[in-house]
């Protein structure tokens, strides 16, 4: 076919067009399309979404996918990547708009729960965002001690992590799944903050509150992206403002700041630690995976998505921004929405980053025996081991 076209153009005045075609054809051949996982559909002309997006993912630029090996490679990569990630999340917009803003907070109630004092608070992380949080104070906490911030995932009960249940069934389920994360933290001797994750609870839209919807994540995403912000960026901002407040108002050992949460709380944990270097230890549960093998191929809430994230890198690259600080991914072997095989793949890449940073032992993957839940046995020994290495 190409020879006939060549002879036709050669015999006419289309030599310029011929040159264009000759230049263009090699580019067509260079497009990387992976072998189809469903070639039968392609043969009969059917659209196959996994095949289509596998090709798109394979051709994503991933400008900051780590491929170095030395400490110098690592430091140069991290210095360039972090500001680009923060920009993509919309944090640069928040930082510019609220550069001089100091969040205010108000305590609403306080109660003695035997082993701790439990306080309900509001903090205005933005002038128009009163964010509820629960503070658990260890009794006789006069000396500086560590702080644990525990963002929750997708749940109607935003106070579950603080040991507040709406029914006995919820209590049984919460305790079985070890979801009383802030209670665990205060029993370990830390100040514990259990914040409402933005888009849930009192931070839902009024319409969603009336409908008793679990969240307003979709509305939050759609409205955020109009101005270059994202729900993940908003939630990272909230964590940073809580750290600001805690440093100013509690006797916190500022070298011992931990963030840990399950599922959507794991998302917040990973991105917050990647962006805010004041976080000493990060332990996301039921989240760390590959983007392609989880939110890129399995149905998830809209709040998980950051437009263009894979033009920068994969999830392991984002987690690599936490290095050299300790990071432990806690994950269930039977998790169906963040498959463990993809988590292991991501961890192999993350281990390369931590090795280049000179601290291969500062990252771990703890595998629980069950599915999508919190595994406290993978959290607190890791936290204790690494915080004990931080001097007072």
Per-segment meaning from a language model:
Residues 93-142:
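N-terminal cap/lid segment of alpha/beta-hydrolase-fold proteins
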Residues 143, 149-240, 247-248, 293-298:
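Cap/lid segment of the alpha/beta-hydrolase catalytic domain
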Residues 219-227, 241, 279-320, 324, ...:
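Mobile cap/lid helix-loop segments that gate and shape the active-site cleft of serine hydrolases
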Residues 251-262:
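Alpha/beta-hydrolase fold nucleophile elbow
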Residues 261-265, 269:
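Gly/Ala-rich beta-loop-alpha elbow adjacent to hydrolase catalytic centers
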Residues 322, 329-331:
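Short beta-strand/loop motif that positions the catalytic acidic residue
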Residues 334-338, 372-373:
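Acidic catalytic loop of the alpha/beta-hydrolase fold
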Residues 348-392:
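C-terminal catalytic histidine-bearing segment of alpha/beta-hydrolase fold enzymes
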């Amino acid at each position: 076919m190409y020879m006939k076209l060549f002879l036709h153009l050669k015999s006419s005045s289309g030599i310029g067009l011929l040159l264009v075609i000759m230049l263009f054809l090699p580019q067509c051949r260079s497009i990387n399309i992976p072998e189809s996982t469903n070639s039968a559909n392609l043969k009969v002309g059917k659209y196959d979404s996994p095949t289509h997006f596998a090709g798109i993912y394979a051709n994503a630029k991933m400008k900051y996918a780590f491929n170095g090996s030395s400490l110098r490679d690592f430091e140069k990569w991290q210095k360039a990547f972090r500001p680009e990630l923060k920009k993509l999340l919309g944090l640069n917009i928040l930082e510019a708009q609220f550069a001089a803003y100091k969040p205010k907070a108000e305590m609403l109630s306080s109660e003695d729960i035997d082993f701790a004092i439990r306080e309900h608070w509001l903090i205005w992380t933005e002038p128009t965002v009163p964010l509820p949080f629960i503070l658990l104070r260890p009794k006789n906490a006069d000396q500086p001690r560590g702080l644990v911030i525990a963002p929750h995932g997708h749940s109607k009960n935003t106070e579950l992590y603080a040991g507040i249940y709406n029914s006995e069934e919820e209590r049984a389920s919460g305790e079985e799944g070890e979801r009383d994360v802030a209670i665990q933290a205060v029993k370990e001797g830390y100040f514990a903050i259990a914040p409402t994750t933005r888009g849930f609870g009192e931070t839902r839209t009024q319409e969603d509150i009336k409908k008793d919807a679990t969240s307003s994540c979709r509305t939050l995403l759609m409205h955020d992206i109009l101005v270059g912000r994202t729900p993940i960026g908003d939630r990272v901002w909230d964590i940073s403002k809580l750290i600001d407040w805690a440093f100013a108002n509690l006797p916190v050992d500022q070298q011992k700041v931990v963030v840990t949460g399950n599922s959507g709380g794991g998302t917040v944990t990973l991105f917050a630690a990647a962006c805010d270097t004041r976080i000493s230890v990060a332990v996301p549960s039921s989240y760390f995976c590959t983007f392609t093998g989880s939110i890129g191929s399995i149905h998830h809430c809209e709040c998980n998505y950051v437009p263009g994230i894979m033009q920068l890198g994969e999830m392991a690259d984002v987690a690599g921004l936490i290095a050299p600080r300790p990071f432990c991914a806690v994950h269930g072997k039977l998790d169906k929405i963040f498959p463990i095989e993809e988590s292991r793949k991501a961890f192999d890449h993350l281990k390369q980053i931590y090795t280049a940073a000179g601290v291969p032992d500062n990252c771990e993957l703890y595998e629980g025996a069950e599915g999508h839940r919190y595994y406290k046995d993978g959290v607190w020994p890791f936290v204790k081991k690494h915080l004990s290495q931080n001097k007072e």
